[in-house]
């Protein structure tokens, strides 16, 4: 016969665990909203910057501009930036982005191209360190909601690696936020920039909304139209110098947005994982309660039978 006290203790333990997972779900949901607000707040600057770059490149003719960040080189070494989380309890978030990085590394090896890693997040750092991969830099302990200063620090090092020709291309592997239950690891080239890299048409931003008491994601398609500069506009500085100053800002902004999307993906994955854990805990509590009631009923029945048997013996 099952031990009633053991079942009762286990029920209480699962209830306590459910309280923790539910609290973690609510915290993650609140932080997803903050990540969303940050993405939206940085959008006007990104739009204005893209518009200026678009017009400058059109005015100067892209192919005629000789700037380091626009120069295509023979690719011998690729710098791969892998963005992961610092903690677990977020489903397959970390394993998916690491798997995508491994896949990209395999592709480069098959092409005879070397690679150098820049890891962001403790999980990616630990994974590749254990495998003695060539890690150029490691970044851990960043804010859960990435800041512009953090992105600028990382972007400066990436630009240094590219401009010093330590690497011939910089690729960013991060998790793009799709929905609360879906995310997708993607590969984006940060440097060198191409004309396609400045296109923002049909870009999307996400909004976390509450509908009928449930959290949902609403994606908004950005249909930005680039406004052209007047043909007789006179630049106080050389347009090439302006472009040279703005390109690092653009890369910095792209990195910041990728970090924000990755953070939102991690928080959404954690929220989903904790929601599933809470649901599973509720089901387990129901199963244990049923087992407890059956065991208690069996114990009472056994006691009654013993009393009746004793009375008959008299």
From Swiss-Prot:
Gene3D superfamilies: 3.40.1380.10, ATP synthase, gamma subunit, helix hairpin domain (1.10.287.80). It is found in: Cellular thylakoid membrane. The keyword Chloroplast does not apply. InterPro entries: ATP_synth_F1_ATPase_gsu, ATP_synth_F1_gsu. GO terms for cellular component: plasma membrane-derived thylakoid membrane; proton-transporting ATP synthase complex. Keywords: ATP synthesis, CF(1), Hydrogen ion transport, Ion transport, Membrane, Thylakoid, Transport. It is a peripheral membrane protein. One of its GO terms (molecular function) is proton-transporting ATP synthase activity, rotational mechanism. It comes from the Bacteria. Produces ATP from ADP in the presence of a proton gradient across the membrane. The gamma chain is believed to be important in regulating ATPase activity and the flow of protons through the CF(0) complex. HAMAP family: ATP_synth_gamma_bact. F-type ATPases have 2 components, CF(1) - the catalytic core - and CF(0) - the membrane proton channel. CF(1) has five subunits: alpha(3), beta(3), gamma(1), delta(1), epsilon(1). CF(0) has three main subunits: a, b and c. Belongs to the ATPase gamma chain family. NCBIfam families: ATPsyn_F1gamma, PRK05621.1-2. This is ATP synthase gamma chain. It comes from Crocosphaera subtropica (strain ATCC 51142 / BH68) (Cyanothece sp. (strain ATCC 51142)). The lineage of its organism: Bacteria, Bacillati, Cyanobacteriota, Cyanophyceae, Oscillatoriophycideae.
């Amino acid at each position: 016969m099952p031990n009633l006290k053991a079942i009762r203790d286990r029920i209480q333990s699962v209830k306590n665990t459910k309280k923790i997972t539910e609290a973690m779900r609510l915290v993650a949901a609140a932080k997803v909203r903050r990540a969303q607000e940050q993405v939206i707040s940085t959008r006007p600057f990104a739009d204005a910057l893209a518009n200026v770059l678009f017009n400058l490149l059109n005015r100067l003719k892209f192919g005629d501009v000789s700037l380091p960040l626009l120069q295509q080189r023979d690719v011998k070494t690729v710098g791969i930036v892998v963005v992961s989380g610092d903690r677990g309890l977020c489903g397959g978030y970390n394993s998916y982005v690491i798997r995508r990085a491994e896949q990209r590394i395999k592709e480069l090896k098959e092409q005879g191209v070397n690679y150098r890693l820049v890891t962001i997040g403790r999980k990616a750092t630990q994974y590749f360190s254990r495998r003695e991969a060539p890690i150029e830099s490691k970044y851990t302990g960043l804010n859960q909601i990435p800041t512009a200063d953090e992105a600028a620090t990382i972007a400066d090092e990436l630009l240094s690696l590219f401009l010093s020709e330590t690497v011939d291309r910089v690729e960013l592997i991060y998790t793009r936020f799709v929905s609360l239950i879906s995310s997708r690891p993607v590969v984006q080239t940060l440097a060198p920039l191409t004309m396609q890299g400045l296109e923002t048409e049909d870009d999307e931003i996400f909004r976390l909304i509450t509908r009928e008491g449930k959290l949902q994601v609403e994606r908004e398609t950005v249909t930005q139209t680039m406004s052209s500069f007047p043909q007789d506009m006179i630049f106080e500085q050389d347009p090439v110098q302006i472009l040279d100053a703005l390109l690092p800002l653009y890369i910095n902004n792209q990195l910041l947005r990728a970090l924000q999307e990755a953070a939102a993906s991690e928080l959404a994955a954690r929220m989903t994982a904790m929601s599933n854990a809470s649901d599973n805990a509720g089901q387990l509590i129901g199963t244990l309660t049923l087992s407890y009631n059956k065991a208690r009923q069996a114990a009472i029945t056994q006691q009654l039978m013993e009393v009746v048997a004793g009375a008959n013996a008299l």
